Design a protein with these regions (language model features):
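Long, charged, low-complexity intrinsically disordered regions
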Residues: 1-98
């Protein structure tokens, strides 16, 4: 292990990670969803974002179910709904923050 941890960081991440209004959950497991969404919402609030998109995919809806469970409990969420067909349809959820 190197003494300088910056050497272990890929070049594209050395400038920081850009936070956007979209979270893509492809490749994640349902048990990871609560922490990911809570962090995503906190970052969005810090940036003053009011509308977010969470992409969970169309598959078996396991991720979508977990996403909706977390959003229902969040004190920061005003409402959420399926994205328009142009934005992913039922494979993505739009979130409006308070």
């Amino acid at each position: 292990m190197s003494k300088n941890k910056n050497n272990d960081i890929p070049e594209e991440f050395k400038q920081g990670i850009r936070i956007t209004d979209t979270l893509d959950l492809h490749g994640f497991f349902p048990e990871q969803i609560p922490d990911l969404i809570e962090d995503f919402i906190e970052n969005a609030l810090d940036l003053g974002l009011k509308t977010l998109k969470i992409i969970h995919g169309k598959g078996k809806s396991r991720l979508k179910f977990e996403v909706h469970q977390v959003l229902k409990k969040s004190p920061h969420v005003q409402k959420f709904y399926n994205a328009s067909s142009e934005s992913g349809g039922w494979g993505a959820t739009m979130v409006e923050l308070k």
